[in-house]
């Protein structure tokens, strides 16, 4: 198959195919007797797997997996996929935890009128590093006030809500949906606890969709491994 035909079939550019070859994530193209580049069914299996995995695992993980498969290191490739799945499961647990916290707040089981937390306290409570909190503040996603007595940053309860929400999306893939959710968090009003819970639910639905995308990618990965005779 000519590269142009493979590109059209997978809705890619021929330059993308050349980049994949240069990055070592697909085998080099073969040459016909006239010297023209051509792809085999094995190339197509690689390309279909990359397209399927990228939406759920991202190109970085997908590329690393393809290189490991080309080196016939199946075990490392599959454990890398397993690690990505574990991270997604962790993010789902974080989203569910945020929803539970907002439910408790709505029922009055927490104190929304507290003085908030210092950056160290917020980092310890949420598990988000101080450097990340400073970065989020620099990007305008959260805001802090200054303690009048010592000048330390303090995050109010509404800002802590934002931190819990952003923590849920901290490691997810860059996508239009993740950007939209972060913008919703940025615009979240201090007194709108109900909207905070809605955003947490939207984040959970987004993670559920990613889980389905990972399943689809795993199916194509299985097909590729079987074609390459990498499975026992």
What spans do the regions from the language model cover?
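Major-groove DNA-recognition helix of helix-turn-helix-type DNA-binding domains
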Residues: 17-33, 130-149
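Long amphipathic alpha-helical coiled-coil segments
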Residues: 143, 147-155, 227-231
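Arg/Lys-rich, alpha-helical DNA-contact motif
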Residues: 1-10, 22-116, 157-232
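Amphipathic alpha-helical protein-protein interaction segments
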Residues: 116, 124-127, 139
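Phosphate-backbone recognition surface of nucleic-acid-processing proteins
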Residues: 139, 151, 158-161
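Short alpha-helical "recognition helix" segments of helix-turn-helix
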Residues: 6-7, 20, 122-124, 136
């Amino acid at each position: 198959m000519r590269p142009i035909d493979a590109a059209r079939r997978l809705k890619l550019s021929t330059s993308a195919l050349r980049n994949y070859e240069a990055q070592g994530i697909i085998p080099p193209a073969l040459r016909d007797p006239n010297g023209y580049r051509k792809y085999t069914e094995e190339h197509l299996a690689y390309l279909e797997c990359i397209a399927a995995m990228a939406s759920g695992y991202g190109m970085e993980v997908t590329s690393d997996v393809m290189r490991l498969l080309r080196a016939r290191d199946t075990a490392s490739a599959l454990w890398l996929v397993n690690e990505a799945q574990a991270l997604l499961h962790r993010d789902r647990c974080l989203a569910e935890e945020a929803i539970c916290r907002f439910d408790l707040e709505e029922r009055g089981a927490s104190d929304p009128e507290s003085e908030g937390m210092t950056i160290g306290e917020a980092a310890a409570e949420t598990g988000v590093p101080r450097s990340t909190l400073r970065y989020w503040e620099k990007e305008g996603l959260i805001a802090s006030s200054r303690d009048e007595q010592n000048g330390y940053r303090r995050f109010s309860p509404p800002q802590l809500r934002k931190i819990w929400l952003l923590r849920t999306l901290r490691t997810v893939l860059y996508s239009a949906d993740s950007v939209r959710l972060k913008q919703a968090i940025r615009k979240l009003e201090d007194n709108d606890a109900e909207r905070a819970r809605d955003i947490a639910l939207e984040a959970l639905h987004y993670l559920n969709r990613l889980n389905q995308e990972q399943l689809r990618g795993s199916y194509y990965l299985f097909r590729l491994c079987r074609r390459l005779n990498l499975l026992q």
